[in-house]
């Protein structure tokens, strides 16, 4: 089975933006939130009212919102400042960890590149050392050829001497 991840909503979070923009000290009421969403977003309130109520209830359950008055979806709502600060702190920690990981990866890449360069230099040095060794070997081959020619002459002289004796 394929694991599917939930896509984030394409629209902005209407309820939280409404509560933050209304800036009421004792919290924003459901009616005030509805009016703000109707005026600022292109939304039909008849269809979206149920979703807004559900968003308010789930926000209170999750701790993102605090209900200052009333019960359920009716009453007044404020953003939970403590939860927002905690989330901001968690995000900051995650960003720091990501930055550390990226720094470690970059260091590892730099070390790997340095090792490759050292290896390339070492192999180039070995090749340079190996090349002079080959040159003397060629000279030795030439010397061997020179030695062969006198041997032929001595062999010819040996053959010539027995002929004269008999």
UniProtKB/Swiss-Prot annotation:
Q: Which InterPro entries match?
A: H1/H5, Histone_H1/H5_H15, WH-like_DNA-bd_sf, WH_DNA-bd_sf
UniProt cross-references to CDD domains, sorted A to Z? H15
Residue span of the signal peptide, if any?
none
What are the H15 domain coordinates in residue numbering?
6-81
Spans of biased composition, class Basic and acidic residues? 90-120
Which region ranges are annotated with the description Disordered? 90-166
Gene3D superfamilies, per database record: Winged helix-like DNA-binding domain superfamily/Winged helix DNA-binding domain
GO terms for biological process, alphabetical? chromosome condensation; negative regulation of DNA recombination; nucleosome assembly
Amino acid composition bias (Basic residues), ranges on this chain:
124-138
Q: Which family does it belong to?
A: Belongs to the histone H1/H5 family.
Name of this chain's protein = Histone H1.1, embryonic
- Source organism: Parechinus angulosus (Angulate sea urchin)
């Amino acid at each position: 089975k394929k694991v599917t991840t939930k896509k984030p909503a394409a629209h902005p979070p209407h309820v939280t933006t409404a509560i933050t923009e209304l800036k009421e000290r004792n919290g924003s009421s459901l009616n005030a939130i509805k009016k703000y969403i109707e005026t600022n977003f292109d939304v039909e309130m008849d269809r979206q009212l149920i979703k807004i109520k559900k968003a308010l209830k789930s926000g209170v359950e999750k701790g993102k919102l605090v209900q200052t008055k009333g019960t359920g979806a009716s009453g007044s709502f404020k953003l939970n400042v403590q939860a927002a600060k905690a989330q901001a702190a968690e995000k900051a920690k995650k960003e720091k960890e990501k930055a550390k990981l990226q720094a470690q990866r970059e260091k590892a890449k730099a070390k790997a590149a340095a090792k490759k360069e050292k290896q390339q230099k070492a192999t180039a040095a070995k090749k340079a050392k190996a090349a002079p060794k080959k040159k003397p070997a060629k000279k030795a081959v030439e010397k061997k050829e020179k030695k062969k020619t006198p041997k032929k002459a001595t062999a010819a002289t040996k053959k010539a001497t027995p002929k004269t004796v008999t």
